[in-house]
Swiss-Prot record:
Function (record text): Catalyzes the GTP-dependent ribosomal translocation step during translation elongation. During this step, the ribosome changes from the pre-translocational (PRE) to the post-translocational (POST) state as the newly formed A-site-bound peptidyl-tRNA and P-site-bound deacylated tRNA move to the P and E sites, respectively. Catalyzes the coordinated movement of the two tRNA molecules, the mRNA and conformational changes in the ribosome.
Pfam families registered for this protein in UniProt: EFG_C (PF00679), EFG_III (PF14492), EFG_IV (PF03764), GTP_EFTU (PF00009), GTP_EFTU_D2 (PF03144)
Gene3D superfamilies according to UniProt: 3.30.230.10, 3.30.70.240, Elongation Factor G (Translational Gtpase), domain 3, P-loop containing nucleotide triphosphate hydrolases, Translation factors
Annotated protein name in UniProt: Elongation factor 2
Listed SMART domains: EFG_C, EFG_IV
Superkingdom to which the source organism belongs: Eukaryota
CC terms in the record's Gene Ontology section: cytosol; ribonucleoprotein complex
An example Gene Ontology molecular-function term: GTPase activity
Family annotation (NCBIfam families): small_GTP
Keyword Cytoplasm on entry: yes
Catalyzed reactions per annotation: GTP + H2O = GDP + phosphate + H(+)
Species this protein is from: Debaryomyces hansenii (strain ATCC 36239 / CBS 767 / BCRC 21394 / JCM 1990 / NBRC 0083 / IGC 2968) (Yeast)
PROSITE patterns, sorted: G_TR_1, G_TR_2
Length: 842
């Protein structure tokens, strides 16, 4: 047991080369929290007996009850390595002690915004994959998120005990199953070739893959076995490692290595991995689980495992756990992999700086981040807020990228909308204290140097969810995090007792602080709206709201889905609007934007902040836009970065630039609340064809131009075959063959459409993938379990927006009824206005 003090940790923080910041990411229920336990136990925080069951990082009551992780939790661990291990590290280190800042993150897809927040502050990721289920949809999502942030992965294949005890596989089958899983991970990694990151694929023979069981608390890497045998036979360890994976076979008769699986007489040889690595494990399993009392002592002696007297009394699984833990402790394999193969902040920030920092790559702050310089000006990125035990206060959780953050230091707190030289979204305040996050507890420290993860007290009132903290006035913001999910499910919340209203408002404020991806808003009719990414996320948010943040009973409406408004064709004629004083006219046409372009804008490939020439190149080369149009994009909307565009196609208009700001403001307003039923607009391009302006500046101010531009945008959309898009989930269901019929019947009932169905090689499980409209997804998992006898577990991820058939302006169609309901709920007139309402005759 290593009992370590806060002083030791603080000392290690200064040796940045010996710090590792890593997050644990995986599909839901593949065993992240359970694996984290064995590392926590090594650091002497929980007892060995509890490891595997304690799930120490699941700090909330509902996490323990449901057995899922909901919030990402950070914890700092202290590890010391042998000299041999330190020699293998490819980067500079000082001494043998290491500080590992580990963040356990949720696997459930509804909470993937928590994963994004965890990934932003770490440099390496431990990807956990279930050995039976293989790489699932969420494994892929989080792995892609990690690679997009330039984070280096290492893999552990977990739940090997399931393969041995439940499926009773042979050694060769197990090897093939491992190798398939690793291959599918590498396929995902290889799509992100990043020269500055080097090769980030994982290889068992290089030591970047571990195998084990979190529940039983054992794990191994090929490197550990190579070390074992190199001592025993006196061979070089590096050579041994290469031979213990892949097609290499050892012939015991001739004592020679070969890469053919048959010897001279045609007898089949056993693969080296099976013979030297799996064989001892298989033997232990079979002799203990089949209660062969006589074999056990000789086996233990050979493997140099010493049991205490009371441990020898155990039998069956209990004995197996004890023996495997002594033989291959999980913490050793994981720590070795983390320390040797994951980058230190010094290494990582050198190549991550340019993707993290918004400003130019040669300004002082960016260079300080690149060098991870503790003496430079402070740069901290806050990725999320963590509620304290004190109601309503939060720790700001983030990472110091440059400088040193101290208690009582005066800093500039910059929100996500801050721009250099302006005063918006900026506060200059002092930090009350700096703390170290330790799972369920926090420890106070005086200061925290660059490269470490930290909690700050006293800045929570000035930041909503995330932001940058700095001491340099010229510093730009760190880039805003991109979430792979979007809030598409909403409910309206009301108080049961009118006196509680102020509490509800306060509670909603706290809720939106504590979760990176929840949106709270107020509709025009005065309802309070909470929007979340899925059913489970919504359920957790509402229970938090009722029990913690507001602490009052609430009335909750049935869930509502958010839609998008779009157009299907070009406007049938040019739309024209005149300003209120009749002196200015704007002529425009609307047309749809290709889905690919919209997706690129949403992903951030086409960015409003990019240089306009570079952006025009992308649009012209990849999407066939006309270059002159592509250069004349005035703005993106809504919120300045949405998938709608204003393109200036005018010829020689006087005073045009003077009204540009007004046009942009009007377009943001028009795309935030569309003409059909006040939802966001998506994939609409508005071309300004001509503008007639009054010669006097006073007659063409914002008050004249803004309402005109908004009306003409509406008119052009209503003339262009308006349509509605609904959000669609991608569903992945793993189930045995006999449950497939039940799945199909539920999907058909819910307008679902199956896109693929395949059997996972070597297992009896099938994977069914389908599209399911979000509107139909409520209660889907419950119905699915009923019709399949609890054998099918769905995973829902927001996938895309799909056009709904039918005319939204016709109240008799199915789409029309949705529109009508929504308009009535928001207190508008029930019928969609015709274009005449916004169109002016010459």
């Amino acid at each position: 047991m290593v009992a370590f003090t806060i002083e030791q940790i603080r000392e290690l923080m200064d040796k940045v080369t010996n710090v590792r910041n890593m997050s644990v990411i995986a599909h839901v229920d593949h065993g992240k929290s359970t694996l984290t336990d064995s590392l926590v136990q090594r650091a002497g925080i929980i007892s060995a007996a509890k490891a595997g069951e304690a799930r120490f990082t699941d700090t909330r009551k509902d996490e323990q009850e449901r057995g899922i992780t909901i919030k990402s939790t950070a914890i700092s661990l202290y590890a010391s390595m042998t000299d041999d291990d330190c020699k293998e590290i490819q980067q500079k280190t000082v001494g043998n002690s290491f500080l590992i800042n580990l963040i356990d993150s949720p696997g459930h897809v509804d909470f993937s915004s928590e994963v994004t927040a965890a990934l932003r502050v770490t440099d390496g990721a431990l990807v956990v994959v279930d050995c039976v289920e293989g790489v699932c949809v969420q494994t892929e999502t989080v792995l892609r998120q990690a690679l997009g942030e330039r984070i280096k992965p290492v893999v552990i294949i977990n739940k090997v005990d399931r393969a041995l005890l439940e499926l009773q596989v042979t050694k060769e089958d197990l090897y093939q199953s491992f190798s398939r899983t690793i291959e599918s991970v590498n396929v995902i990694i290889s799509t992100y070739v990043d020269s500055s990151l080097g090769d980030s694929q994982v290889y068992p023979d290089k030591g970047t893959v571990a195998f084990g069981s979190g529940l039983h608390g054992w794990a191994f890497t090929v490197r550990q076995f190579a070390t074992r045998y190199s001592k025993k036979f006196g061979v070089d360890r590096i050579k041994m490692m290469e031979r213990l994976w892949g097609d290499s076979y050892f012939n015991p008769k001739t004592k020679k290595w070969t890469n053919k699986d048959k010897d001279a007489e045609g007898k089949t040889l056993e693969r080296a991995f099976n013979m030297f690595v799996l064989d001892p494990i298989f033997r232990l399993f079979s002799s203990i689980m089949n209660f062969k009392k006589s074999e056990i002592p000789t086996l233990l002696e050979k493997l140099e495992i010493n049991l205490k007297a009371e441990e020898k009394e155990l039998e069956g699984k209990a004995l197996l756990k004890v023996v495997m833990r002594k033989f291959l402790p999980a913490a050793d394999a994981l720590l070795e992999m983390i320390v040797i193969h994951l980058p230190s902040p010094v290494t990582a920030q050198a190549y991550r700086a340019e993707t993290l920092y918004e400003g130019p790559a040669d300004d002082a702050s960016c260079i300080a981040i690149k060098n991870c310089d503790p003496t430079a000006d402070l740069m901290v990125y806050i990725s999320k807020m963590v509620p304290t035990s004190d109601k309503g206060r939060f720790y700001a959780f983030g990472r110091v990228f440059a400088g040193t953050v101290k208690s009582g230091q005066k800093v500039r707190i910059q929100g996500p909308n801050y721009q250099v030289g302006k005063k918006d979204d900026l506060f200059v305040k002092a930090i009350q204290r700096t703390v170290l996050m330790m799972g369920r507890f926090v420890e106070a420290i005086d200061d925290c140097p660059a490269g470490n993860i930290v909690g700050l007290v006293g800045v929570d009132q000035f930041l909503l969810k995330s932001g940058t903290i700095t001491t340099n006035e010229a510093s730009h913001n760190m880039k805003v995090m991109k979430f792979s999910v979007s809030p598409v499910v909403q409910v309206a919340v009301e108080v049961k007792n009118a006196n509680d209203l102020p509490k509800l408002v306060e509670g909603l404020k706290r809720l939106s602080k504590s979760d990176p991806c929840v949106l709270t808003s107020m509709s025009e009719s005065g309802e309070h709206i909470v929007a979340a990414t899925g059913e489970l996320h919504l359920e957790i948010c509402l229970s938090d709201l009722q029990n913690d943040h507001a602490g009052i009973p609430l009335k909750i409406s049935p869930p509502i889905v958010s839609y998008r408004e779009t157009v299907n064709a070009e406007s049938s004629m040019v739309a024209l609007s005149k300003s209120p004083n009749k002196h200015n006219r704007i002529y425009v046409k609307a047309q749809p934007i290709d889905e690919e372009v919209s997706l690129d804008i949403e992903k951030g490939v086409i960015n409003p902040r990019d240089d306009f020439k570079a952006r025009a190149r992308i649009l012209a080369d990849n999407h066939g836009w006309d270059v002159t149009d592509a250069r004349k994009i005035w703005c993106f909307g809504p919120d300045g970065n949405g998938p709608n565009l204003v393109v200036d196609q005018t010829k020689a208009v006087q005073y045009l630039n003077e009204i540009k700001d007004s046009v942009v403001a009007a377009f943001q307003w028009a795309t935030k609340e569309g003409p059909i039923f006040g939802e966001n607009v998506r994939s609409v391009r508005v071309n300004i064809l001509d503008v007639t302006l009054h010669a006097d500046a006073i007659h063409r101010g914002g008050g004249q131009i803004i309402p005109t531009m908004r009306r003409v945008t509406y008119a052009s959309m209503l003339l262009a075959e308006p349509a509605i898009q609904e959000p669609v989930f991608l569903v992945e269901i793993q189930c045995p063959e006999n449950a497939i019929g039940g799945i199909y019947s539920v999907l058909n009932k819910k307008r679902g459409q199956v896109i693929s169905e395949e059997q996972r090689p070597g297992t009896p499980l099938f994977t069914v993938k389908a599209y399911l409209p979000v509107n139909e997804s409520f209660g889907f998992s419950g119905e699915l379990r009923q019709s399949t006898g609890g054998q099918a577990f769905p995973q829902l991820i927001f996938d895309h927006w799909a056009n709904l058939n039918g005319d939204p302006t016709d109240p008799t169609s199915k789409v029309g009824t949705i529109v009508k309901e929504k308009r009535e709920r928001q207190g508008m007139k029930p019928d969609v206005p015709g274009y005449e309402e916004y169109y002016d005759k010459l």
